[in-house]
Curated annotation (Swiss-Prot):
The lineage of its organism: Eukaryota, Fungi, Dikarya, Ascomycota, Pezizomycotina. Residues 74-86 have a biased composition (Low complexity). Its main location: nucleus. It is found in: Nucleus. Signal peptide: none annotated. Residues 50-92 are annotated as: Disordered. Fusaric acid is phytotoxic to plants such as cotton and banana. It has been shown to induce programmed cell death in plants. In addition to a mild toxicity to animals, fusaric acid exhibits acanthamoebicidal, antioomycete, and antimycobacterial activities. It comes from Fusarium oxysporum f. sp. lycopersici (strain 4287 / CBS 123668 / FGSC 9935 / NRRL 34936) (Fusarium vascular wilt of tomato). Pfam families: Zn_clus. Transcription factor that regulates the expression of the gene cluster that mediates the biosynthesis of fusaric acid, a mycotoxin with low to moderate toxicity to animals and humans, but with high phytotoxic properties. This is Fusaric acid cluster transcription factor FUB10.
Length: 416
């Protein structure tokens, strides 16, 4: 028999597993082929000699299990070798390993990527399989949880009632990643249509500087009045701010003075599509504000300072701390600039944009940009690549130039 080593001659016996693995000569005492070899005796381990294995290279991508041999496992190892298929038979393990080779992790490893590049966070990532089976039940629950916007009381935060309804009433709770990406795509489509409309269609520039007093709930006065580009882009800013806050991890977040922003200890890993859509929405908002402020500055230049306040329907008296503010012709323009700077600051803080990509200025002692969505090294590389790609295209809008142009025209309105 091939496995009976006692009947073999010393020069025909098989080497032990340890010597065969190290490709060394297996020395034993002459006439005692069944004893342990000298190398195993010197190392103080058990000398195990298995049956001869088939020659040749093993199949490609076959997972070789690691076998650890201990004292008292000789019977179990021999039983395993006896039940193994012969050299000419079919290997069942190789058939089982075929499904393992088709896993997503092996495919991503072969192309140099990781599965974490496509996920946002383990806390807010939702599996796709239960969504398909529970789509009808979730739809009915979402309808039951829908809140009438008219019942919402006015708050101190700057927001509008035209935001898309979500299943969660608390803005601090995270939105599911697939919902965030869908809502960002819808917002991007609305901003593209608004950018085209504000460039091609005429609109009331004088109404942009019109001061009014509102005693109603927040957002109700805008719903009744005629749609204005400034109101539309302000609603888009608030919606983008809420969506960006939904991408932050609430477990390790600390509440900041902003209504929506949270500061996590470690920035979450986002999908590339989410980062690019959010960046494109921000660039479109900056472009729309750049067109609005350019028209406003041209209007201020064409109108004398003495007649700037003549378009007000009724004289308004503003008070700070009970003291009236003296009337100023350029007060409305300065208030508008500061309001938009504060609004963009909230978005830029959530996105974590560097200083040269921001419209608003931040304090030097803060590090909000490092904790935003573009705070990681991977996101910073993606941001630089996207901005450089936008600069190299012919006939398209220059992203850096629109940020600089908006900063310049806002500074001109302040100094007017």
């Amino acid at each position: 028999m091939a496995g009976d080593f006692s009947n073999r001659a010393p020069w025909k016996r098989s080497a032990c597993d340890r010597c065969r693995a190290q490709k060394l000569r297996c020395h034993r005492d002459s006439g005692h082929s069944t004893d342990a070899c000298l190398r195993c005796l010197k190392s103080g381990i058990e000398c195990v000699t298995s049956k001869a294995r088939p020659t040749g290279r093993p199949p490609s991508r076959q997972v070789q299990p690691t076998v650890s041999v201990e004292q008292g496992d000789t019977s179990s190892s021999s039983h395993t070798t006896d039940s193994s298929p012969s050299a000419g038979g079919t290997d069942i393990n190789s058939m089982m390993n075929f499904e393992y080779d088709l896993s997503l992790d092996n495919i991503l490893d072969s192309i140099g990527m990781q599965h974490s590049d496509f996920i946002v966070n383990d806390n807010i990532l939702v599996d796709i399989s239960p969504l398909s089976s529970q789509s009808t039940s979730q739809h009915s629950v979402a309808q039951a949880q829908t809140v009438d916007p008219s019942t919402i009381q006015s708050t101190t935060s700057y927001q509008f009632n035209s935001l898309p309804s979500t299943s969660s009433m608390d803005s601090a709770l995270p939105i599911r990643s697939d919902h965030v990406e869908l809502l960002l795509s819808r917002l991007h489509s609305k901003l593209s249509a608004q950018l085209y409309s504000i460039r091609s269609s005429p609109w009331d520039v004088k109404g942009t500087l019109n001061l009014s007093l509102a005693h109603q709930g927040i957002g109700q006065d805008f719903e009744n009045c005629e749609s204005h580009p400034l109101v539309q882009v302000s609603q888009a800013c608030t919606e983008l701010e809420k969506l960006l806050s939904g991408l932050r991890a609430p477990a390790s977040a600390e509440h900041t003075p902003s209504s929506f922003s949270y500061t996590p200890a470690v920035p979450p890993r986002l999908r590339t599509t989410q980062l690019l859509i959010a960046l494109s929405c921000y660039i479109q908002i900056v472009s729309i504000y750049g067109i609005i402020f350019s028209k406003v500055f041209d209007y201020l230049l064409s109108t004398s300072k003495t007649s700037i306040g003549s378009y007000q329907s009724s004289p308004l008296t503003l008070y700070i701390g009970g003291l009236p503010i003296p009337p100023n012709e350029t007060l409305s323009g300065n208030l508008l600039v500061h309001l938009i700077e504060h609004q963009l600051h909230q978005i830029e803080q959530l996105m974590g944009l560097p200083e040269h990509y921001r419209v608003s200025s931040r304090a030097k002692d803060t590090k909000d940009g490092e904790l935003g969505l573009f705070g990681s090294q991977h996101s910073q590389s993606l941001l630089n690549a996207a901005i450089q790609l936008g600069e190299d295209r012919d006939g398209n809008h220059d992203d850096i130039r629109c940020v600089r142009a908006l900063k310049v025209v806002m500074r001109q309105i302040k100094d007017f």
